[in-house]
Amino acid sequence: AQSVVDLGCGMGSYVRHFSREGLRAIGLDGNPSTPQLSKGACGVLDLSVIAEVAEPCDWVLSLEVGEHLPKVYEAAFMENLNRFNTQGMVLSWALEGQGGTGHVNEQSNDYIKAKICALGYVNDANAEASLRQAAQFAYFKRTIMVFRRTAWQDGMTQG
């Protein structure tokens, strides 16, 4: 991968890390204070509204974001995950009953996997297992999921 977008980037920690590693990294978050919180590294995007994406990245990263959006916005959020990548996504979504500040749409891994795979992805179980094993936070050991595109759409080319 040469580029990644972090949807729901918070303070931009992953964006700064990926940039230091030589990737083109973009961070977007629904919080209007994101530019200040990220020291100018990231921008603002309402992830509950389907975005027009001029230049998608190779991969999307979105960790513990979907559960903060009411279910009515779930499909739009997932479409944004889809539109912002050309190769795949690394996603985590709080599990039902996990609990957490602002969690309004916790879902099972199976539910999320079915929804994302219906958009034209396959679950990369090997990459997922590697990331879960390496995860520092206990909840990531249960919630990290990896998806790869199965088909290229509208002139997208494999990078």
Task: Give a label for each model feature.
Residues 141-159:
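Flexible, glycine-/basic-rich loop-and-beta segments that form/coincide
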Residues 94-102, 124:
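C-terminal alpha-helical "lid/dimerization" subdomain adjacent to the S-adenosyl-L-methionine
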